[in-house]
A protein has these predicted regions:
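Hydrophobic core of transmembrane alpha-helices in multi-pass small-molecule transporters
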Residues: 81, 96-119, 230, 316-334
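Extracytoplasmic gate region of multi-pass secondary transporters
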Residues: 23-28, 155, 220-275, 336, ...
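Helix-to-loop junctions at the C-terminal end of transmembrane segments
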Residues: 55-67, 271-283
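Intracellular juxtamembrane helix-capping segments at the cytosolic ends
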Residues: 30, 119-132, 139-140, 334-347
Length: 425
């Protein structure tokens, strides 16, 4: 049954690992508990995204060969990384300002959990496309939507746990979640299976197979896919990382939590909606052109109206800013869900897990550059002023939009001129 063997295990895996995006819920609590600045602790999240992409790139061949081994590795490393993070938070609470505690969190949350993220993200994708051959976009969108929706589902639960578990709630929460997510992922691992009768194409070696597959098209086309994927993630992370402060700038600080949940739903909806829509199109690259067009138009409107810098609380400007946030979140999610199916249309299903894994290295580098780029711009341009009772830099946030608009335009050019249309294989 394609739902039991494909869709449900994919959701169990992705709804677990997708909670990595709940980082902002507890990052300040970790920093306060172990006695370090929030900036120092933030690197754990950047490392997690980096190793997500790199582990997907390096373990793509393993996923291609044995999804049961890769999904088991994902279950163990993700849960172990969570439990290890809890341990080093506990250690830091007993030994404030301990470098060992900080480095332990980097290794546990960043490296070990990052391996679980990459292998867990990749493991069910090809299997879903094999089960849903006529609706590959809908199938992968459903699973990847689970990754995006995980934040909306888990954030209120984590917030309640932090307050309800009393003293030391931050490290207790990680212990509990490690157990819960291991059970979910292990069940997903047990029931995940490719369709009966599917035989992997034989190649002389893993690398030879990937290289030969990529050579079936001009390499410029693959470079274009990689770069536009990278740019979409970089711009998405840059804007999403400043989302909370942008919302406060337009006078909606009290509703920041609700807006964050709605934006997470747009993220998940974009993953499902754009990929399902792409099933009806001749060329899935059209979806990326649509994503980049919507992103450019929404950022330009906010820039031209100075919607963030104008803090007067104009209702129309507030609508423009909220539309920008929701559109960017939807496009960010849609970019992820369409990559595996776009690659399968160009290169076939033979080495799709390995090629998808290599392409996810773009996520690794975007995880390091997106947030950091936005932070650098906000820190070094404009100035912090009192806005609705909080210190914010409206001009800095506007400048982030200027840079992302330019990058979105570059991505549009890549999509139009470098990524060639292909008939589906």
């Amino acid at each position: 049954n394609k739902w039991i063997r494909g869709a449900i295990p994919a959701l169990l895996l992705h709804c677990s690992i997708g909670t990595v995006y709940c980082w902002s819920i507890f990052s300040q609590e970790i920093a306060d508990y172990i006695g370090f600045s929030k900036g120092a602790v933030e690197w754990a999240f950047s490392f997690a995204i980096f190793f997500l992409g790199m582990s997907a790139a390096f373990f793509g061949g393993l996923v291609e060969k044995n999804i049961h081994k890769s999904s088991l590795i994902a279950s163990i490393t993700f849960a172990l990384g969570m439990a290890g993070t809890g341990f080093f938070i506990w250690y830091g609470g007993n030994n404030p300002h301990s470098v060992l505690s900080l480095v332990g969190i980097y290794i546990s949350y960043g490296f070990i959990m990052g391996i679980g993220l990459g292998t867990g993200y990749l493991s069910p994708v090809k299997t879903l496309m094999l089960w849903f051959k006529d609706k590959k976009g809908l199938a992968t969108g459903l699973a990847v939507a689970g990754f995006g929706a995980a934040k909306a589902i888990a954030s209120p639960i984590m917030s309640r746990m932090l307050t309800g578990l009393g003293e030391g709630g931050i490290f207790k929460m990680f212990y509990i979640l490690a157990c819960v997510y291991f059970v979910m992922m292990f069940i997903g691992h047990l029931i995940l299976a490719k369709p009966e009768g599917w035989v992997e194409p034989q190649t002389k070696s893993k690398n030879e197979g990937i290289i030969a597959t990529l050579k079936t098209e001009p390499i410029a086309s693959y470079i274009g896919i990689w770069l536009m994927f990278y740019i979409n993630i970089t711009c998405g992370l840059a804007i999403i990382s400043q989302e909370k402060m942008i919302v406060k700038c337009v006078g909606l600080g009290a509703a920041a939590g609700i807006i964050s949940t709605i934006s997470a739903l747009f993220n998940a909806g974009g993953r499902l909606g754009f990929s399902a829509w792409a099933d009806k199109l001749k060329d899935r690259n059209t979806i990326y052109k649509l994503i980049f067009t919507l992103s450019i138009v929404s950022t330009l409107i906010v820039l031209l109206t100075k919607g963030i810098a104008n803090v007067a609380g104009n209702t129309v400007l507030i609508v423009f800013v909220l539309a920008l946030i929701f559109i960017v979140n939807a496009g960010y999610g849609g970019g992820f869900s369409n990559v595996p199916t776009l690659l399968s249309d160009h290169y076939g299903m033979g080495n799709i897990s390995a090629i998808h894994g290599i392409t996810l290295s773009a996520w690794a580098f975007a995880g390091l550059t997106g947030n950091q780029m936005a932070s650098f711009i906000v820190k070094h341009t404009g100035s912090f002023i009192d806005v609705h009772g909080v210190q914010a830099n409206p001009v800095g946030y506007q400048n982030v939009l200027i840079v992302t608009t330019i990058l979105y335009a570059v991505a549009m050019c890549l999509s139009c001129f470098l990524v060639r249309p292909m008939s589906k294989k």
